[in-house]
Amino acid sequence: FDKLVFGDAGWGDEFLIATLMTLLVSILSMGLGLFLAIITVWAKIIQNRITRFIANFYTTVIRGVPELLVIYLIFFGGNAVVMSIAKVFGYNKYIELNALTIATIAIAVISATYSSEVLRASYLAISKGQIEAARALGMNKFSIFFKVISPQVIRHALPGIGNVWQITLKDTSLISVTGLVEIMRQSRISSNVEHSP
């Protein structure tokens, strides 16, 4: 417990900052991931083969690739894409992307694949008879979505979204490759300096 002392005598300050970084990346990634998941679910449930194929391809590939590889691809590939776009507009200087932004996007891309499956299953759990009954009552699409579909999807999805939150929190231990110091990286740093676990 000596490591958790605040000030010069311990690592408490550093652990607190690293914990806040872990929570910040997790919360931002979960929010962005849910937004991407909603778009992915929409692409999967509409009657368009192309969007369904793209959404299924995205979720299958990202879930099948190791999370660390996804982070590397977005970290290094993101810089290359931004530099290429900048060169099109005549800007030839080096552009370095913010590590927090890259880490958030990478974890969100991973989180979105799992969240989309949870939300899609929750949507499919709703009886089609309820939607037909709402149409028979004269409700428009927006009313049906916000008054009939959304409350039930949220209720069905909450347990699964809790599991996705745990996956997202776990995956933040990989973001140290972008240069951010999160809780696991900070514990390794303190262990190496103190020569004790």
Q: Residue spans of the language-model regions?
A:
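Transmembrane alpha-helices and adjacent helix-loop boundaries
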Residues: F1-P197
